[in-house]
Amino acid sequence: MEEEMSNRRVSNRTRKVATKMAAALTSNDNRTQAAIARLEALENDNGAIEVIDLNDDEEASLDEDDDLGYLQKKQHKGSKRKTRQAKALEARKAPKSFLELLQEANLESLPSHVPTYLKAAVGPPSSSSRRYFCSVCGYIAGYNCCLCGMRFCSIRCQNIHKDTRCQKFVA
Protein backbone atom coordinates (compact mmCIF):
# COMPACT_ATOMS: atom_id res chain seq x y z
CA MET A 1 0.00 0.00 0.00
CA GLU A 2 2.85 2.36 0.90
CA GLU A 3 4.62 1.54 -2.37
CA GLU A 4 1.55 2.49 -4.41
CA MET A 5 1.36 5.86 -2.68
CA SER A 6 5.08 6.61 -3.23
CA ASN A 7 4.92 5.79 -6.98
CA ARG A 8 1.96 8.10 -7.48
CA ARG A 9 2.57 11.43 -9.20
CA VAL A 10 1.41 14.47 -7.32
CA SER A 11 0.03 17.55 -9.02
CA ASN A 12 1.25 20.98 -7.95
CA ARG A 13 -1.70 22.68 -9.62
CA THR A 14 -4.02 24.43 -7.19
CA ARG A 15 -7.75 23.98 -7.32
CA LYS A 16 -9.81 27.03 -8.08
CA VAL A 17 -13.22 27.15 -6.49
CA ALA A 18 -15.77 29.73 -7.59
CA THR A 19 -16.24 32.54 -5.07
CA LYS A 20 -19.94 31.79 -4.59
CA MET A 21 -19.15 28.12 -4.07
CA ALA A 22 -16.39 28.91 -1.57
CA ALA A 23 -18.67 31.29 0.33
CA ALA A 24 -21.41 28.66 0.43
CA LEU A 25 -19.02 25.99 1.68
CA THR A 26 -17.56 28.11 4.45
CA SER A 27 -20.91 29.15 5.92
CA ASN A 28 -21.84 27.27 9.08
CA ASP A 29 -25.52 27.16 8.10
CA ASN A 30 -24.82 25.04 5.03
CA ARG A 31 -22.55 22.74 7.00
CA THR A 32 -25.17 22.22 9.69
CA GLN A 33 -27.82 21.56 7.03
CA ALA A 34 -25.55 18.95 5.44
CA ALA A 35 -24.91 17.35 8.84
CA ILE A 36 -28.65 17.23 9.58
CA ALA A 37 -29.32 15.70 6.17
CA ARG A 38 -26.68 13.03 6.83
CA LEU A 39 -28.22 12.24 10.23
CA GLU A 40 -31.71 11.93 8.71
CA ALA A 41 -30.35 9.59 6.04
CA LEU A 42 -28.75 7.46 8.76
CA GLU A 43 -32.00 7.38 10.71
CA ASN A 44 -33.90 6.29 7.60
CA ASP A 45 -31.32 3.56 6.95
CA ASN A 46 -31.58 2.32 10.53
CA GLY A 47 -35.38 2.25 10.27
CA ALA A 48 -35.35 -0.71 7.89
CA ILE A 49 -34.81 -3.34 10.57
CA GLU A 50 -36.29 -6.72 9.76
CA VAL A 51 -38.82 -8.00 12.30
CA ILE A 52 -38.73 -11.70 13.18
CA ASP A 53 -41.82 -13.41 14.58
CA LEU A 54 -40.80 -15.78 17.36
CA ASN A 55 -44.18 -17.57 17.38
CA ASP A 56 -43.86 -18.52 13.72
CA ASP A 57 -42.53 -22.05 14.28
CA GLU A 58 -45.31 -24.22 15.73
CA GLU A 59 -43.19 -27.38 16.06
CA ALA A 60 -40.54 -25.64 18.15
CA SER A 61 -43.13 -24.53 20.70
CA LEU A 62 -44.37 -28.07 21.45
CA ASP A 63 -43.39 -29.67 24.73
CA GLU A 64 -41.10 -32.66 24.29
CA ASP A 65 -42.85 -34.55 27.11
CA ASP A 66 -46.18 -34.31 25.32
CA ASP A 67 -46.38 -37.03 22.65
CA LEU A 68 -49.84 -35.96 21.48
CA GLY A 69 -48.96 -32.30 21.08
CA TYR A 70 -49.63 -32.31 17.36
CA LEU A 71 -53.18 -33.56 17.99
CA GLN A 72 -53.93 -30.86 20.54
CA LYS A 73 -52.95 -28.04 18.17
CA LYS A 74 -56.36 -27.97 16.43
CA GLN A 75 -57.86 -24.61 15.56
CA HIS A 76 -60.76 -23.27 17.56
CA LYS A 77 -63.82 -22.33 15.52
CA GLY A 78 -63.89 -18.73 16.73
CA SER A 79 -60.24 -17.88 16.06
CA LYS A 80 -58.86 -16.91 12.69
CA ARG A 81 -55.65 -18.40 11.45
CA LYS A 82 -53.08 -16.04 9.99
CA THR A 83 -52.19 -16.69 6.41
CA ARG A 84 -48.67 -16.50 5.06
CA GLN A 85 -49.57 -13.31 3.23
CA ALA A 86 -50.86 -11.69 6.43
CA LYS A 87 -47.67 -12.67 8.26
CA ALA A 88 -45.57 -11.24 5.44
CA LEU A 89 -47.52 -7.97 5.48
CA GLU A 90 -47.13 -7.72 9.24
CA ALA A 91 -43.39 -8.28 8.93
CA ARG A 92 -43.16 -5.58 6.25
CA LYS A 93 -44.76 -2.90 8.40
CA ALA A 94 -42.52 0.11 8.47
CA PRO A 95 -40.69 0.42 11.76
CA LYS A 96 -41.24 3.61 13.69
CA SER A 97 -38.68 6.37 13.88
CA PHE A 98 -37.19 7.49 17.17
CA LEU A 99 -39.37 10.61 17.29
CA GLU A 100 -42.53 8.53 16.76
CA LEU A 101 -41.52 6.21 19.59
CA LEU A 102 -40.94 9.21 21.88
CA GLN A 103 -44.39 10.58 21.06
CA GLU A 104 -46.03 7.20 21.70
CA ALA A 105 -44.27 6.82 25.04
CA ASN A 106 -46.34 9.75 26.36
CA LEU A 107 -43.51 10.96 28.56
CA GLU A 108 -45.45 14.02 29.73
CA SER A 109 -47.86 11.83 31.70
CA LEU A 110 -45.09 10.41 33.91
CA PRO A 111 -44.43 12.00 37.32
CA SER A 112 -41.83 14.76 37.42
CA HIS A 113 -39.39 12.77 39.58
CA VAL A 114 -39.10 9.99 36.96
CA PRO A 115 -36.14 10.60 34.61
CA THR A 116 -37.02 10.42 30.92
CA TYR A 117 -35.15 10.89 27.68
CA LEU A 118 -36.22 14.52 27.44
CA LYS A 119 -35.44 15.37 31.09
CA ALA A 120 -32.05 13.66 31.33
CA ALA A 121 -29.49 15.93 32.93
CA VAL A 122 -26.26 16.73 31.18
CA GLY A 123 -23.09 16.99 33.21
CA PRO A 124 -20.93 20.07 33.41
CA PRO A 125 -18.92 20.96 30.32
CA SER A 126 -15.61 19.19 29.95
CA SER A 127 -12.47 21.05 30.95
CA SER A 128 -10.45 19.33 28.21
CA SER A 129 -10.73 20.26 24.57
CA ARG A 130 -13.28 18.63 22.31
CA ARG A 131 -12.27 15.41 20.55
CA TYR A 132 -12.83 15.11 16.82
CA PHE A 133 -13.20 11.75 15.09
CA CYS A 134 -12.44 10.66 11.54
CA SER A 135 -15.54 10.61 9.33
CA VAL A 136 -14.18 7.56 7.48
CA CYS A 137 -12.76 5.17 10.08
CA GLY A 138 -13.68 6.66 13.47
CA TYR A 139 -10.16 7.20 14.84
CA ILE A 140 -9.15 10.53 16.36
CA ALA A 141 -8.89 13.04 13.52
CA GLY A 142 -6.17 15.62 13.24
CA TYR A 143 -7.16 17.12 9.90
CA ASN A 144 -10.28 18.50 8.26
CA CYS A 145 -11.38 18.93 4.66
CA CYS A 146 -10.97 22.48 3.41
CA LEU A 147 -14.01 22.10 1.14
CA CYS A 148 -16.65 20.63 3.42
CA GLY A 149 -15.15 20.69 6.93
CA MET A 150 -15.50 16.98 7.68
CA ARG A 151 -12.62 15.43 9.59
CA PHE A 152 -10.18 12.65 8.70
CA CYS A 153 -7.09 11.11 10.31
CA SER A 154 -4.72 10.09 7.53
CA ILE A 155 -3.93 10.45 3.83
CA ARG A 156 -5.71 7.16 3.14
CA CYS A 157 -8.88 8.41 4.83
CA GLN A 158 -8.51 11.75 3.05
CA ASN A 159 -8.47 9.97 -0.32
CA ILE A 160 -11.55 7.94 0.61
CA HIS A 161 -13.25 11.11 1.81
CA LYS A 162 -12.49 12.95 -1.43
CA ASP A 163 -13.75 10.04 -3.54
CA THR A 164 -16.95 9.21 -1.68
CA ARG A 165 -17.90 11.47 1.20
CA CYS A 166 -16.91 15.04 0.37
CA GLN A 167 -19.95 17.32 0.48
CA LYS A 168 -18.42 20.04 -1.70
CA PHE A 169 -21.37 20.02 -4.09
CA VAL A 170 -24.13 20.16 -1.45
CA ALA A 171 -24.41 23.96 -1.46
Swiss-Prot record:
Zn(2+) 1 binds at residues 134, 137, 153, 157. Residues 73-85 have a biased composition (Basic residues). Induction: Not regulated by circadian rhythm, photoperiod or vernalization. PROSITE patterns: ZF_HIT. GO terms for cellular component: nuclear speck; nucleus; Swr1 complex. Zn(2+) 2 binds at residues 145, 148, 161, 166. Expressed in root, lateral root primordia, shoot apex, leaves, stems, inflorescences, flowers, axillary buds, developing siliques and premature seeds. It comes from the Eukaryota. GO terms for molecular function: identical protein binding; zinc ion binding. Residues 63-87 are annotated as: Disordered. A zinc finger (HIT-type) spans 134-166. GO terms for biological process: cell differentiation; chromatin remodeling; defense response to bacterium; flower development; regulation of developmental growth; regulation of flower development. Disruption phenotype: Early flowering, leaf serration, production of extra petals and weak apical dominance. Its main location: nucleus. It is found in: Nucleus speckle; Nucleus. Component of the SWR1 complex which mediates the ATP-dependent exchange of histone H2A for the H2A variant H2A.F/Z leading to transcriptional regulation of selected genes (e.g. FLC) by chromatin remodeling. Coodinates SWR1-C, FRI-C (FLC transcription activator complex), histone methyltransferase and general transcription factors. Represses flowering by positively regulating FLC and MAF4. Binds to the promoter region of FLC chromatin. This is SWR1 complex subunit 6. It comes from Arabidopsis thaliana (Mouse-ear cress). The gene is SWC6.
